[in-house]
Amino acid sequence: MKGNGSTLLNASQQAPGVGEGGGPRPSWLASTLAFILIFTIVVDILGNLLVILSVYRNKKLRNAGNIFVVSLAIADLVVAIYPYPLVLTSIFNNGWNLGYLHCQISAFLMGLSVIGSIFNITGIAINRYCYICHSLKYDRLYSNKNSLCYVFLIWVLTLVAIMPNLQTGTLQYDPRIYSCTFTQSVSSAYTIAVVVFHFIVPMIIVIFCYLRIWILVLQVRRRVKPDSKPRLKPQDFRNFVTMFVVFVLFAICWAPLNFIGLIVASDPATMAPRIPEWLFVASYYMAYFNSCLNAIIYGLLNQNFRQEYKRILVSLFTAKMCFVDSSNDPADKIKCKPAPLIANNNLIKVDSV
């Protein structure tokens, strides 16, 4: 424990104004990183609270699939409430002065958030796969009770996955990014295991699920005759695309950092110094930025979320209660039932985020 504490103190002493190769860091760098982080924190908190409130208020959004969406929003909120503000403090102070305990808690919660996000995105992909490709079994597999159990299992697995970080000494302060985080160069074997099991394997599962969905949707569209009534509603397709975009942006934002981890783990002593500091910093803050994107995606691509966002914001400005069920709105009285699509299992339905 003392050894880790001294490592933290030594690292924090290296932070002020020192850049790659021991030279001075650009004066604008800290300001730019602070701006990115402030924007991320504000949009993360406001956006994900809107997501949670929207699902709570609107019966059309209160379904088994959106239980995973709320869980993902909670994972994104975790970093905005505690770790990111501490990183911001470190930027303003040009080093970490909050002590060893806060460093460990911050790094732990950051890892909890990212692994929780990956596992929830995987859960969402499996949910969409079952909904579309195995629609006859979906209601039995994804009752509200079962979905809550799946989300609980996701967070249990997340805790199990993150706990070894507390024992391996990999949670340390890195002055390059002003953050207490997972240190890739401490253990090659452990870093490779983290990247493989916490990123690559979940991504393979997600890619498989969405690839199967795309294939099935294309097959269904080709089977529909020109003179027949289309069975795949545009809104249904947009709802699926919404969650696909969430996955793609997550992969884009987190892939560079994970690939850097694999490169460093191959030979820490040789490869770590060869990673350009600008690339390392950019990959980290691109990953940080991802936590504020999901709520924006829902608002842009999903009509139900977009309408509920507007209602919540209007209710705030008109001093109405945000927690009132909005499903009694006249515009929502038209019930939308998912259209069955002839495909695998003879039925295919695409509905909800």
UniProtKB/Swiss-Prot annotation:
InterPro entries: GPCR_Rhodpsn, GPCR_Rhodpsn_7TM, Mel_1A/1B_rcpt, Melatonin_rcpt. Residues 1-32, 88-105, 169-190, 265-277 are extracellular. PROSITE patterns: G_PROTEIN_RECEP_F1_1, G_PROTEIN_RECEP_F1_2. The keyword Glycoprotein applies. SUPFAM superfamilies: Family A G protein-coupled receptor-like. Glycans are attached at N4, N10. Disulfide bonds join C103-C180. Keywords: Cell membrane, Disulfide bond, G-protein coupled receptor, Glycoprotein, Membrane, Receptor, Transducer, Transmembrane, Transmembrane helix. It is found in: Cell membrane. It holds the Pfam family 7tm_1. It is a multi-pass membrane protein. One of its GO terms (cellular component) is plasma membrane. Residues 54-66, 127-147, 212-243, 299-353 are cytoplasmic. It comes from the Eukaryota. Belongs to the G-protein coupled receptor 1 family. High affinity receptor for melatonin. Likely to mediate the reproductive and circadian actions of melatonin. The activity of this receptor is mediated by pertussis toxin sensitive G proteins that inhibit adenylate cyclase activity. Possibly involved in sleep induction, by melatonin activation of the potassium channel KCNMA1/BK and the dissociation of G-beta and G-gamma subunits, thereby decreasing synaptic transmission. This is Melatonin receptor type 1A. It comes from Phodopus sungorus. The lineage of its organism: Eukaryota, Metazoa, Chordata, Craniata, Vertebrata.
